[in-house]
């Protein structure tokens, strides 16, 4: 299943990428590919990341997204994730 996650949060992109690095092994168990794009918000202190991933283990992915560490990070950074299911066309 291909997904797009739009994450909007208070903090720097580096903080987000550091958090993702903490989940590196778990992500490898849940996704065959994952890519990140940075969106310029033009707002000091606010960041937006677009993540595209091919999820191969939905249960594992859900476990990552709802883990205590992830929830703690989300709360600390006032993060909002909007998740879309996407279909590859070509």
Language model region names:
Residues 1-71, 80-90:
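Short S/T/G/P-rich N-terminal loop/turn motif that feeds into the first structured element of a domain
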Residues 76:
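Regulatory input/activation interfaces that engage signals or partners
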């Amino acid at each position: 299943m291909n997904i797009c996650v739009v994450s909007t949060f208070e903090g720097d992109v580096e903080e987000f990428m550091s958090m993702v690095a903490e989940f590196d092994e778990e992500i490898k168990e849940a996704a065959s590919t994952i890519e990140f794009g940075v969106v310029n918000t033009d707002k000091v202190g606010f960041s937006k990341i677009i993540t595209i991933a091919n999820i191969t283990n939905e249960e594992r992915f859900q476990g990552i997204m709802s883990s205590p560490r992830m929830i703690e990070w989300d709360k600390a950074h006032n993060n909002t994730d909007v998740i879309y299911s996407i279909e590859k066309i070509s």
